[in-house]
Every structure is written in structure tokens, then in C-alpha cells.
Amino acid sequence: MKLFLLTLLLVTLVITPSLIQTTMAGSSFCDSKCKLRCSKAGLADRCLKYCGICCEECKCVPSGTYGNKHECPCYRDKKNSKGKSKCP
């Protein structure tokens, strides 16, 4: 039993850093893409929030500050509870 727990602990310690790096890399990707996407938005903080949510789920952000949603169908097809586009 002790050997099993020790093995599980070692595996967890080896895997955890790689998962953290992957998450951080995804976040920096989304942060930079959303910063560009929301650079001309009137409500930049709201734009950045929803762009970040959509980017994390879809793994892409359309180019430019407006439109071009055909480049990322997942981003384009996300809707809020009112049926409007969730992603800026």
C-alpha cells in the first residue's frame, strides 16, 4: 500500500508541472489574441473577459478587431442565453 501511494505521489509530481505549463501557454496565447481583438472595443474589460472565455474553449480567436468570425467556427457559434453571439 505504501509503495502504491509513493508511486502515485511521484507520478503526480512529474505530471503536474507539464500541465501547468500547458495551461499558462494557452492563457498567454489567448491574452495576446484577445488584447488585439478588443483593442478598439468601447467596453474593453468586458470584451477581454468574453474573448478569453471563448478563446479557452475554442482555442482560436478571429483576426482583426471586428468580424472575420468565419476563421473560427466554434468562436462564431457560441451564443449567450438570449441567442446573441457570446464572443466579441
Swiss-Prot record:
It comes from the Eukaryota. Six disulfide bonds may be present. One of its GO terms (biological process) is defense response. Expressed in tubers, stems, axillary and young floral buds, sepals, petals, stamens and carpels, but not in roots, stolons, shoot apex meristem or young leaves. It is found in: Secreted, Cell wall. Keywords: Antimicrobial, Cell wall, Disulfide bond, Plant defense, Secreted, Signal. Pfam families: GASA. Residues 1-25 form the signal peptide. Induction: No responses to methyl jasmonate, ethylene, abscisic acid, salicylic acid, isonicotinic acid, indolacetic acid, gibberellic acid and infection with incompatible bacterial or compatible fungual pathogens. Disulfide bonds: none annotated. GO terms for cellular component: extracellular region. Belongs to the GASA family. Has an antimicrobial activity. Causes a rapid aggregation of both Gram-positive and Gram-negative bacteria, but the antimicrobial activity is not correlated with the capacity to aggregate bacteria. PANTHER family: EXTENSIN, PROLINE-RICH PROTEIN, SNAKIN-1. This is Snakin-1. It comes from Solanum tuberosum (Potato). The gene is SN1.
